[in-house]
Amino acid sequence: MAKIIFVKDEQNEFQAYDFLQNLIVEEPLMATLVFQGLLQLETAETRKLSTGKQILPDVHLIIGKSQAYSLQTTRIETTVDQPIQEMKAHFKDKNCRLIYFTAFSGDETYYCFVKGYFKDKNPFTDQMSSYREEVKRVFLRRIEAETSIGNSDYQFETLKNKALENEGIAHYLESFSASLGKYIFSKRMEKKWSQLDLALKSDLSPVIIGRLEAGDPDLTLRMYQKVCTVLGVKATFSVD
C-alpha cells in the first residue's frame, strides 16, 4: 500500500485537499471517478530502479463507450529527479486536474498532492503552467514542506469518509463492479503490467481495460471473468 498525503502550497494552504473537499459537494459525479482513481493509487507503489528512474503506476479509467467520463494519470516532468505527475478527470465539458509528486521513506511510497484546479478553456487565464511550476518549486523544497501527516483535519482517510457521506458516491465506490475494478488494477500492478500488456494478453482493447478497471457497470461479467483469468485469479460469479 502507498500513502496519499497533502502538502502545503506556497500560500501555506493544503489547497489540493480543499479542492477535493469542494469537488465532493459541488461536482459529486466527477468526484466519484477521482476517488476511484485515488483509491487505486493507494494500492500502487512506485518502483524505484537503481538508476534512480521511477516506474510509475498508470491509472486510466473510462466509463461509457463515448469516453466522455474518464480519468488518467500522466507524468508532466520527465527528469529523473523531478517525479511530478498530474491526475486528469474529464466529465462532459469539465476537466479537473490534481498535481502531485512522489516521495519515499524507506520502503514506503507517498503520493504528495499539492494543487487541484479546473482547466480553463481560455489559454490566457488558465493557471496550468503556473501551478505546475509552483509544484516543482514545492518539490525542490520538500524537506522544508509542511505535510498533512499527523494532522487529522487533512488526512486522506478523513476526506474519503466525507466522500462516502454522499450516497451517490458511496453507491458507486462500494458497488460490486467498482470493487472488482480496483481488484483487477491491484493484480495488474502486482504483475508489473501496463494496461496495454493486459489488453494484449486478454485480447481486449486498452479502452475496455480502462472501463473494466473503472468498474463500468455496462460491461458484461464475461469480460471481467476473462481479465481475471489472464491475471491468474479464479473468478466465479453467481446471481442470487
Model-found features: residue ranges?
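Short basic helix-loop element that most often maps to the first helix and adjoining turn
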Residues: 182-201, 226
